[in-house]
Each structure stands twice: as structure tokens, then as C-alpha cells.
Amino acid sequence: MSNVVHVDDKNFETEVLQSEVPVLVDFGAAWCGPCQRQLPIVEKFATDNGNVKVCKVDIDDAPVVASKLGIRGVPTLMLFNEGKFVGSKVGLTSLAEISNFVLTKTG
């Protein structure tokens, strides 16, 4: 996962909110089956899209961030641009859906 940055409560602000490029954040958990299926899709997106920073947050390692952002189910993808939340998708999401989601939300 060299193209995916692991983020937790300590570095969320720096890695996501202060990023100069759009950031796709994959919220999941080790115990979540669909999250494990989402991971290789997110990794492929990260490899194919160098203009978007991709971060992975395990909600058990980042309970403050997960609570603050209202994460109720996983996997959840959230997109941030210029430090602001611009959209989310809940549930297992295909590579094409992720690409379209990011493109429509960031132009």
C-alpha cells in the first residue's frame, strides 16, 4: 500500500485537511469483510490517480475522527478538497464508481 497513507486521530488534520491536493479517505475496520474487499480497489485507484491523495483510516485506530465525521457504517469513502468535505459514499464501491465520484466532486 505504498500509495495509500495510513491516517489516525493524530495525523488526520495534517494529512487530509491541510493537503494541497484532493484527498480520498477510505474509512474501514480490520473486522469488516466489505472493507477488506474495498482495500485493493482503493489501492488501484491510488496507483492510477497520482493527482489525488488517498488515505486509509481504521475507525478503531481513529475513534475521534470517525465520531467527529459521523461515520456510521464502513466502508465509507469521504472526499476532501482544499480542506473541506465535498462528498461521501457508503458501502463497497467499484473502481469506476470511485473514479466518477472523485471526478464529479473535484472537476
Please name every model-derived segment.
Residues 4-23:
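A short beta-strand-turn-helix
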Residues 6-8, 27, 39-64:
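Thiol-based oxidoreductase modules, predominantly thioredoxin-like and allied folds used
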Residues 24, 42, 75-88:
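A short, hydrophobic beta-strand/beta-hairpin element that forms part of a small beta-sheet core
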Residues 32-35, 77:
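The canonical Cys-X-X-Cys-His
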Residues 81-107:
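Non-catalytic, surface beta->alpha helical segment in thiol-disulfide oxidoreductase systems
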